[in-house]
Each structure stands twice: as structure tokens, then as C-alpha cells.
Amino acid sequence: MNPGEPNRTYYPALDGLRGVAILLVIFLHNFGFTNYFFFGWLGVDLFFVLSGFLITDILLNTSGKKNYLRNFYMRRVLRIFPLYFFTLIFCLFLIPVFNQSLNISYYKENQLWLWTFTQNWLYVFKDPYGSPTLLHFWSLAVEEQFYLIWPFIILLVKKPKRLLWISFLLLVAVMITRVLLWKFQIEDLAYDSLYTFTRIDGICVGSMIALILRIQSQVLVKYKWLIVFILAGLNFIIYFLNLNSASRLPYLAFVGYTTFAVLFGILVYDAVTKNSALIKLLFANKVLIFFGKISFGFYVFHWPVYLLLFPNFRNLLTGNYQMQQGVAQLISAVIVTIISIIISVISLRYFENFFLKLKKRYS
């Protein structure tokens, strides 16, 4: 059992997968200048699948219990709100006092969206890319919006088979929404990447995996490898072998996000149903579990820390030490990443854990 989580078996491999997810994001953001980690955005989609699976599993376990909704939302608040709002306050009000290099004015002018977890809608309607400091918070907004509704659906519908169909139909609706946006020439990165109704594929797939396990369906057992072969081949040929980054977006807009989410869903399914040596070796190792444990703080902190410190380290190394630009960037990225890891460990141990222990009151 996880501390503070009701009736949930602990799967070390899921923490390992969470570690994979955060490392993908870090490689994309902190080492993006190498152009080797263009696929790092997949880390967010893996987070979505894991979140959908774990949250749905918890909701199914507790849906018949007293104070079901209160307990769920209080646990959610205790996990997300303290660190989220601490970082928000720090970035909005303290960073500008000590550092004027980051453009925080965009967020100050539109801060109501951030306080209400609706900033991804803001990013869709008003271009945020000139001020990236808190852009990564979009994924937290998508999750919170989904979980405002999903617990009520589970409470009302109850039956896992019906919930599975609802999840599937929602997944199809997301794909149709993206196709329609493309058809009407709303070919905008923000719509495809940040819009709630085009980016909940992973959460839906994760929910479906939890429901498939609940009803003990054999569909994945029978067709798993066929699905993996087709989707992995499709993604490899159309996405990874495509050197033109601009032409990858149409594929993602139509089916790419969904196909990657399904592959991650199968990975989660294997992580919780197989106790194989390979799964343990790949995902239940101490290194990935460590990064999985600190993943929330690491995700929240890494981007502001990078934007604050990376230019300073790079300029110091290229100026004072006359290093080549590429070498200076690489060393600076490593230093900044280590600093973010240290901050995340301190945050988990001395800040987040205080609130995580309170979750036991709402089990």
C-alpha cells in the first residue's frame, strides 16, 4: 500500500515509469539544444496515462464508501495545491524582485487563469510562447479539469463495463475533435498540444487500463502484441523517421497522441500484471524509482530553475572560461539539472511529505 492512498497495491514499476516520464521531459527542456530529444514531450503523455490509471483505480476502490468525493478531492488538494501554489507565488512575486531577465508580466496580467487551473485555455487563446516560465503548468491544468468531472461519472455510472465504454467514447471524441480542428484549418500548436479536449487521450487510456483490469477482460492478453506491433511500427515510421518536425504535427493531430497513449497504456498494464525480471530490471530499479518519487517537484521546479540559471552558467563558461558554445551549454544544462534534483529532494522531504502524511486522514 502507498501511504495515504486507500486500498491500492504499490507497484514499484509504476514509480519507475514515472521516473521515465520526468526524465523525458527534462531531456527535452534542459537538453533540447542538442536536438536529440525532440520526443521528450512523450513524458507528459506517459504522466497522463499513469495518472488516469492510478486515479481511476483509487476512485473504483472508494466509490461505495462514505465521503467518497470529499476524501478524493482532499487527497488531490494535499498532493497538488501546496507545491503548485508555492511555486506560483515564488514565480509571480519573488522572482521579479531578484531577477528581471524572465518575462513574468504575461502571467501577472493573466494570473487568474493560473490560480484556477485553467491556464491551458489561456495559452490556447493568447500566445504564451514569449514568456515560457510557467508554460509547463498546462498539463497540471488539464488533469485538474478532468478530475473535476471524472469522480462524479464513476459515482453515477458505477458499473466498470459502462465506464469502460464511456472512456472509449471519450477517447474517440478527442480524436474527432482534433480532426475537426484540422479540417477547419485551426492548425495551431496550442490547440493540438494544450487544449483540454485534444490532450486527454492519455488520461482516458489510463482509465481504460484500470477498468479492463477491474472487469478482468482478456482483450489485451489476446491482442496486445498485435497492437504493439502495429502502433509502434506506425509511430516509428511516421514520427521518428520523419526528419521534418513541422510535418510531424498533422500525424499527432490525427492519431499520433492516441497511438502513443495506447502503447503507454499497454506498458502500464504489463507493469501491474507481470512480475517478470525484465519489468523489474527496466522499471523497478532504484534509479528510476528515485526519479519517480521526486517527479512532481522535479516537474514543477525544473523549468523556472533552468530559465533562471542556464543563461548565467552558459555566459560564465563562454565568457570567463572561453569554452566553446556547445560544451558550455552541455555543462550548464548538467549543473542546472543537478540543482533542480537537489531542490526536488529537499522539497519532497521537508515540504511535500508534510502534506502527504495528512492524506491518511482522508483514506
Where are these regions (language model features)?
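Membrane-cytosol interface segments of multi-pass membrane proteins
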Residues: 1-202, 214-229, 273-277, 287-289, ...
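Acidic/histidine-rich catalytic neighborhood
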Residues: 209-211
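Alpha-helical transmembrane segments and terminal signal-anchor/GPI-anchor hydrophobic tails
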Residues: 221-276
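Hydrophobic alpha-helical transmembrane segments in multi-pass integral membrane proteins
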Residues: 236-242, 297-312
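Feature representing long, continuous alpha-helical segments
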Residues: 253, 257, 261, 265-269, ...
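Juxtamembrane membrane-water interface segments of multi-pass membrane proteins
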Residues: 279-281
